[in-house]
């Protein structure tokens, strides 16, 4: 490694924290100006940093897919829906630009809905992990710490899914549905919690006649799948590839801007 080099950093920030990007950049540049020590050798780093909203990597992924078949993403409206454990976010891109008026990150997250429903169903905190495993695997028979035996979590599973679904449905109808007035609008659904409601979402969009305009980011690039398989956490977190799709798209976008690095 040379004693002095340039580093390019693309950072994904939650939509509500995007306003802090200048402060983050200033602080990061100040840290780099002070230099580093690596194995006793001084290192000087020149940092170039850009911040993007979480979900922009998914947009770049779709942009690349369309370009591969001769289509231009700028000719359509693209809604990126990210269903996370903390919240649900929507990014609206119109003509290739982020439209702030159609974007927000105040939708319901899976975890708050899960906790609410689990408590109402009589599940205590020591069993939260096993209830989560039941939902993720669709296998209701799981170990219960509170009961000291195998337990059928069918009723709590249904309660959690119903509670989350109703919250997502309300948000969709209030925040996303009005943006579908343009016939060239495409919706891309991702996030670690999206797989939990996959069947319900598919049935809902089919009923509305929207199935051809809604895409699920279930098929990931082979390189990403290979990368995730090498991580020890992947066995315990089946949705890890789905969770990493956004950051991987951002990484590929960054690599594509660097002439000196082979894509």
Feature-to-residue mapping (PLM):
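Nucleotide/phosphate-binding catalytic cleft detector across ATP-hydrolyzing
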Residues: 1-78, 98-100, 157-187, 194-263
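Alpha-helical context
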Residues: 4, 93, 97, 140-144, ...
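Short acidic-hydrophobic surface loop/beta-edge motif
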Residues: 36, 104, 142-145
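Short C-terminal domain-edge/linker segments immediately following a structured domain
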Residues: 39-44, 82-83, 110-113, 121-123, ...
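A short acidic Gly-Thr/Ser loop motif
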Residues: 72-88, 93-96, 107-110, 191-193
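Short, functional N-terminal and low-complexity linear motifs
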Residues: 80-87, 135-140, 165, 215-216
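Glycine-rich phosphate-binding loop plus the immediately following alpha-helix
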Residues: 89-139, 239
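C-terminal amphipathic alpha-helical segment
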Residues: 115-177
């Amino acid at each position: 490694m040379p004693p002095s080099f340039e580093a390019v950093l693309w950072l994904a920030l939650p939509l509500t924290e995007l306003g802090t990007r200048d402060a983050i950049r200033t602080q990061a540049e100040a840290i780099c100006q002070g230099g580093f020590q690596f194995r006793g050798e001084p290192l000087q780093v020149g940092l170039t940093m850009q911040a993007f909203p979480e979900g922009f990597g998914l947009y770049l992924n779709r942009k690349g897919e369309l370009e591969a078949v001769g289509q231009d993403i700028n000719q359509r409206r693209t809604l990126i829906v990210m269903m996370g454990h903390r919240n649900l976010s929507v990014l609206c891109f119109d003509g290739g630009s982020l439209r702030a008026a159609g974007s927000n990150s105040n939708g319901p997250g899976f975890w708050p809905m899960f906790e609410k429903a689990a408590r109402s169903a009589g599940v205590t905190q020591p069993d939260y992990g096993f209830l989560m495993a039941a939902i993720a695997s669709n296998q209701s028979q799981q170990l219960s710490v509170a009961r000291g035996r195998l337990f059928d979590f069918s009723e709590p599973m249904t309660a959690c899914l119903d509670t989350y679904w109703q919250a997502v449905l309300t948000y969709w109808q209030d925040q996303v549905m009005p943006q579908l007035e343009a016939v060239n609008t495409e919706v891309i659904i991702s996030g670690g919690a999206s797989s939990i409601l996959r069947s319900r979402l598919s049935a809902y969009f089919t009923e509305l006649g929207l199935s051809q305009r809604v895409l699920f980011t279930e098929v990931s690039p082979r390189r990403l799948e290979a990368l995730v398989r090498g991580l020890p956490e992947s066995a315990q977190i089946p949705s890890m590839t789905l969770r990493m799709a956004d950051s991987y798209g951002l990484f590929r976008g960054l690599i594509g801007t660097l002439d000196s690095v082979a894509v």
